[in-house]
Design a protein with these regions (language model features):
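Polyanion-engaging groove/track-forming segments
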Residues: 1-207
């Protein structure tokens, strides 16, 4: 999923798939026991797909279409936490089911969506191999924190493949700007897909 962000409509199902990855949850301080609560909030706040109106517009949809996007839903959550069952603000109705200790979950979810937005914008731009190497390194650092030996194995493998690809590009003198599709295929080509599936729950590090 992460290496297809520029093409993504950001449906709820994709974000929930990411949240099924232990290494991603660890990076954003989200516990497995938090997932049912997050599922309930996402559904209750009316989130369906799309980061925001601007991201939807990039897919050729009307510019002002913000409703049922992630930003729309998160604003409902934050407003509901702030005012409870109070009146709406700026056309947004508060989602008032958030309170108590669970409210601390809002921050990590906002941080995840913010990180996905930044990554989406960066990955959409063609770049020379050196810049791609930095982007891929940042992607691993921003989204994943190994919480066990299995996670650590795959993240190390991905980092080694990144370095090998960069060395190959340098050895052949490749300095042209490359699109994401080319980089994605080159980086992941060396992964042992069988081990990847075995070592990460639910398909896990979803590149």
């Amino acid at each position: 999923h992460l290496l297809k962000l520029p093409e993504s409509r950001f449906p709820v199902s994709e974000i929930l798939d990411l949240l099924d990855v232990p290494a991603l949850r660890a990076r954003f301080a989200i516990q497995e026991r938090d997932l049912p609560t997050l599922h309930r909030w996402i559904e209750g706040a009316g989130i369906r797909w799309g980061l925001d109106a601007e991201q939807r517009a990039s897919l050729g949809l009307p510019v002002a279409l913000e409703q049922n996007s992630w930003r729309f839903g998160l604003r409902r959550m934050l407003l509901g936490y702030a005012v409870g069952t109070g009146d709406g603000y700026a056309g947004i109705e508060p989602y008032d089911e958030i309170g108590g200790l669970d409210a601390a979950l809002i921050g990590p979810v906002v941080a995840l969506i913010d990180a996905l937005e930044v990554a989406c914008q960066q990955l959409a731009k063609p770049a020379v191999p050196k810049v791609w190497g930095e982007r891929l390194h940042d992607l691993l650092q921003v989204f994943f924190l190994a919480s066990n030996e299995h996670d650590d194995y795959l993240l190390v493998q991905l980092e080694e493949l990144r370095e090998t690809w960069l060395q190959t590009c340098e050895s052949v003198g490749l300095e042209a700007e490359l699109p994401l599709t080319v980089v994605r295929e080159a980086w992941l080509a060396g992964l042992d897909q069988g081990r990847l599936t075995q070592r990460f729950l639910a398909g896990s590090v979803n590149f």
